[in-house]
Amino acid sequence: ALPISVPEGSLGRKNPVRIVWSWIKERKSMKEQSKKTVAKKKFFKMVFSRAGIFVILILIQLLVFLGIPYYLKEYATFIYSAMSVMEIVVLVYIINTEGNPAFKMTWMLCVMALPVIGTVFYIYVHLQLETRFVQNRLAALRMETEPYMDQDEKVTEALWASKSANAQLSYYLSHQLGFPTYRNTEVEYFPVGEDKFASMIKELEKAEKFIFMEYFIVEEGIMWDTILEILKRKVNEGVEVRFMYDGMCAFDLLPYSYPKKLQKFGIKCKMSNKIRPFVSTIQNNRDHRKICVIDGQTGYVGGVNLADEYINEKERFGHWKDTAVLLRGDAVQSLTMIFLQMWDVDMRGVEPYGKYLTKKAESLNDRLGYVIPYADSPFDHENVGEEVYFHILNHAKKYVHIMTPYLILDNEMLTTLIRAAKSGIEVIIIMPHIPDKWYAFAVAKTYYKELIEGGVQIYEYTPGFVHAKVFVSDDDTATVGSINLDFRSLYLHFENGVFIYDNPEVQKVEEDFQNTLAKCHKVTVTEVRNRGVLMKVAGQVLRLVAPLM
């Protein structure tokens, strides 16, 4: 109990109850004042943080943009006529351009709902010089690395003899995008992030030549601190260490100057696509990849980032279900080249790429099947991740089992899922039960009814959040990577994954799916119909702008 200070002799002059009550009111007033002070400090800290300043500068630019028509109101008639003509021209242009119909519909909605703002913003977006620079630079880097990504024709001949449909996918990935098909590659599947973390620590300790790491999210904690200590030690042993992470981390996960901190340890570090306080569409194209390459012999891909929730050391949305794959052998060469292409985007000149490639194995191990590491870029007009998913759905004979954290679909993917189910293929999708983004979950649920009535089975992972991005089919085909079933992953982000065929580890992917399914709740049409009105309305409204989510 807090001591009550009462002036000497006061009890004889004043009511003790009033004295105590006065003291309580004074203490309450002090607490309220303290709360207000803390709130003010938090507010100013938020406003003057990097994220706060970024938002303020963006808002200023938008206000200037919106204020221009007001100051030109005396020319309103002329401007209105000109903008009406421009609106029609832009709408005709949108209709006749190539691209996903969902994106085109969203742009048309913006232009028609807000003629002046929508029209000018569309023109501004499609004149982005920075986007064109990155697009041209990536194309040039692909040409430079092409000699190191040659396809062994003996491998493709064997694949044609084994399964011609997968050989067609192999041809597309190799000839159109430069991602060869490999054999002689061991595959190890990890059903949770903890297993991948334990394996990665062991492999990093073995590094002798170089370590390349590229991740979307990095946050200080048990996972990253452990890895960082190994990286620092390896630098002292003469190992070349390069570390790249997405610029979104500078918002609230890492200081903006964090690359300089790592560089002091001898680690070559950079942020990809830094966040800048200017209205620019390239800031919408995040580096969502998860790649780790060790000595060109060992590589990791999957959904696991470098933060404690991915290994369940920190609970955010119940149990965090994620997956990853280790590759050991020839196929790691593709991961090396994918990393170096992204690393060199903002650099001049060409690296001696050959020094990072290892000699391919001469002996052939038929038991290991076929492995195709692949990557996706928003600037090459090829939706690689989506094409891989379409391929699996269109060529399945028995089943396609899917794990994804998000379900925001265009009409083509929605139709393909339902067509597969109506063709007698067992299509099951596992979604989170505890979402990380309520708005994305609300949009996902707007697809449930149509999918379920079309024969697709939907389950929700009741222990928590599914972050895995997995397709597995017919006991012989699987893909694991960073690519979600949403517009951002399929069209806007830099992504990567690995396609696996005729490898024993595919069975383990399916076993993990069945084990996860046993912990899930099956969603019914009745359940979908009975969900809250607020979530229904929110989902339907947000679906109008789904391509932006």
Where in the sequence are the language-model features?
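Helical hairpin unit composed of two closely spaced alpha helices linked by a short loop
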Residues: 406-425
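Short, small-residue-biased leader/transition segments that mark boundaries at the very start
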Residues: 1-2
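Residue-identity detector for glycine
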Residues: 9-12
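Extended hydrophobic/aromatic segments used for targeting, binding, or gating
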Residues: 412-415, 429-453
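N-terminal localization/anchoring segments of enzymes in phospholipid and broader phosphate metabolism
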Residues: 5, 17-387, 391, 395, ...
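Thr-Gly-centered strand-to-loop micro-motif
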Residues: 403-404, 431, 461, 480-481
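Conserved, well-ordered active-site substructure
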Residues: 471-473
